[in-house]
């Protein structure tokens, strides 16, 4: 018990320092104009390559030639966090996790991480993006808070909703986290999926 408490305090201390580092990065970072589909595709492949046996899912790109204002490293961090969270609760099927981009009729672009996990309790949903809130004792509850801070820095929004997706098993309900970007424009020339490389 003593060791568990000590480990938990150590994690909290490290994560408080992480918040300070992120806030420093946010205050000194400038938004870049990035090709959305290219950046998302690169992040997806980087994430999967870390553990190909476990990190499975589907990528759907629907924002061809669209660029948005966002720091590529910040978007990478947001997506890694959302994908890691989805991986914990998704089912065993190949399409249990889906990463997608789209552009609305009004021209606003977004990227969404969807998984077929169980619905969130309303008491959890209300506090999702608050610092240090978590439904698990081993989690600090800082991941989604940091995602929100990074999105707000670049004029984007992040939200959660329970929504359906078409899968090989039919229409399924799942948990979706969506980042909607502030500014959207079309590239002058069609962008390759790997025009933007995030390292």
Stretches with model-predicted labels:
Residues 86-87:
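Short helix-loop "hinge" at the ATP-lid/N-box region of the Bergerat-fold HATPase_c
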Residues 24-29, 67-70, 135:
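Conserved micro-motifs of the catalytic ATP-binding
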Residues 30-45:
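A conserved beta-strand-to-alpha-helix junction within the catalytic ATP-binding
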Residues 4-9:
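Short alpha-helical segment of the dimerization/phosphotransfer core of two-component systems
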């Amino acid at each position: 018990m003593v060791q568990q408490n000590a480990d938990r305090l150590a994690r909290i201390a490290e994560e408080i320092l992480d918040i300070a580092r992120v806030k420093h990065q946010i205050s000194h970072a400038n938004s870049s104009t990035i090709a959305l589909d290219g950046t998302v595709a690169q992040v997806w492949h980087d994430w999967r390559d870390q553990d190909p046996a476990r990190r499975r899912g589907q990528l759907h790109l629907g924002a061809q030639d669209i660029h948005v204002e966002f720091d590529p490293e910040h978007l990478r961090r947001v997506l890694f966090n959302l994908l890691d969270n989805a991986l914990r609760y998704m089912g065993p099927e190949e399409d249990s996790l889906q990463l997608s981009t789209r552009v609305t009729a009004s021209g606003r672009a977004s990227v969404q991480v969807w998984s077929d996990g169980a619905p969130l309790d309303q008491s959890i949903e209300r506090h999702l993006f608050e610092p240090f809130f978590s439904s698990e004792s081993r989690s600090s509850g800082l991941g989604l808070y940091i995602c929100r801070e990074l999105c707000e820095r670049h004029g984007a929004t992040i939200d959660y909703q329970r929504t359906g997706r078409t899968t090989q098993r039919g229409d399924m309900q799942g948990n979706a986290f969506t980042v909607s970007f502030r500014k959207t424009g079309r590239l002058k020339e069609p962008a390759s999926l790997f025009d933007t490389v995030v390292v």
